[in-house]
Amino acid sequence: MARRNFKVLYVSGEVSPFVRISALADFMASFPQALEEEGFEARIMMPKYGTINDRKFRLHDVLRLSDIEVNLRDKTELLHVKVTALPSSKIQTYFLYNEKYFKRNGLFTDVHNGGDLKGNTEKVIFFNVGVLETLQRLGWKPDIIHCHDWYAGLLPLLLKTVYASNSFFSDVKTVLTVHNVYRQGILPFKVFQKLLPEEVSSALYRAGDNVNMLYTGAEHADLLTTTSRLYADEIVGNGSDTYGLGTVVEERKSTFHGILNGIDTRQWNPSTDKLIKKRYAADRLEGKLDNKKALLDEAGLPFTEGRPLAGIIIGFDAFQGAELLKESLVKLVELDMQLIICGSGDKEYEKYFQDFAAEYPEQVSVRTDYADTLLHLAIAGFDMLLMPGRIESCGMLQLFAMSYGTIPVAYAGGGIVETIDAVTDKSGSGFLFYDYTADAFAGKVQEALDLYHDEERWLQLVLEAMGKDFSWKNSAGEYDQLYRKLLEE
């Protein structure tokens, strides 16, 4: 058991159920709790987006955390903080708010080409500096600041430059976890140069006229992790396919660790889940059909006895598989199944999928406004979960799915291979396709459908999937050891 006076601050741009952009939000919903159970005192900081409902999540103002000054070189912006507990826990979650940056601009927008869509650059600088200013006003000094993805990539550098002489942050260590190597926060250098001291802007990792936020974080964090061993192996030394990130990770591979994701089995357990239509378990599976009927009704699709229901939950961008899905849809609807697509993101993809669904009103439904309640019902109601994303560091959705007896069909990349046992004649927990093409994807779905109609074999597959242990127990123990080793250095 770790010493209880060890404190860890988790910093992320998304945390479920407050806001979900990607699987990172699901990770953040359970990972801090798992580490707190190892004996660490955990807290979370994230932006207070205008889309977050204060009343629903019981956010309240903290008077002593009002009007915090955030100095952006030639100007000062004020920061206000709200707080609530992470649901089903006592973990304090702090929401950093400034009307200019977060009321209308909303979520951080992933930028790959150096653009500054929705003012990302100034927003992310404000957020990173604001985290450190909030800690000082709060008077809570963490032993470790654990940064997640590019949103928090500036923190390690700030601590080693402008905050290095600040006694409040003496001996504070930083960890950066890479959840998605393709989301790196490529933003224009000129904005950093305008808003940050020269000692910071000169140390940023630059690619031409742009700054790479994730690369900058990877250069300066004390420890690097990602969410599976295989994904770590894919990144190391792979400079060309990782926009250069593999190069810095190769240089720092002694401090780079792949640790598999887990899930909170108290929140994600079909026998106790309060967010689904009817609870069920491996020894009483009839409840799963009730969830399927409820989901179809919610999606506006008819129920037909024996007809399989497949689901897709992705962000509408090429990195999460929207392009492959677009290329595959005609092939998929030719198969005898129904399809529910849950996602949001690129408006062109969104329109395409909605227009496509309109052509098949009894077979395809698209939801762009799904909330946590629908996510649970979807995982319980799907017969299979289709995962067209090319790269998954580990992913969380397939872990949720298998725990609920929903069979994944996924591309064999990254941590997916570590979590899904490919179906063979005798065993398995899911289906993997190895060629990233529409034909291979649709072909594997057809293979899954063939097995679905073999009731005895499908039941065996469902029971094997539900019998797997995806709890945080082992992975939390690995992080416990890494944290303690880092703090001893």
Curated annotation (Swiss-Prot):
The keyword Glycosyltransferase applies. The keyword Glycoprotein does not apply. It comes from the Bacteria. It catalyses: [(1->4)-alpha-D-glucosyl](n) + ADP-alpha-D-glucose = [(1->4)-alpha-D-glucosyl](n+1) + ADP + H(+). ADP-alpha-D-glucose binds at R20. Its EC number is 2.4.1.21. One of its GO terms (biological process) is glycogen biosynthetic process. Pathway: Glycan biosynthesis; glycogen biosynthesis. Belongs to the glycosyltransferase 1 family. Bacterial/plant glycogen synthase subfamily. Synthesizes alpha-1,4-glucan chains using ADP-glucose. This is Glycogen synthase. It comes from Chlorobium limicola (strain DSM 245 / NBRC 103803 / 6330). The gene is glgA.
